[in-house]
């Protein structure tokens, strides 16, 4: 494995996240909780494994496309919980397209996670839900295409 270069690695990871990644707040219905998550999915296994080597996530998953056989299979890397917040703090200075999402993402009150047998206060639950909704509102999916041209 190549020697790590923290500043360069964070800049490269930010570029990958800007182009192939997603930041979201996942809602777990089973225990009525929210947690932050960062995902990258792409066809290039080596790049996904590189992320896993430098920022160990949950795991690298192989994702098949059974519905459309013309689509390539992909590989997915993701981190969640406090690891996702740590990753975003590291790449934030280098983000471009997802910078606003990342800044909102970092407002997630993870330090207030309940321990065994304790529940979150309604105030924290509402704050987490609000951040999830705001983050969803920043996504461009489904908002139509913005077409522009420029004279060169």
Task: Place the predicted regions along the sequence by residue.
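Internal intein/HINT superfamily modules and their associated LAGLIDADG
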Residues: 1-152
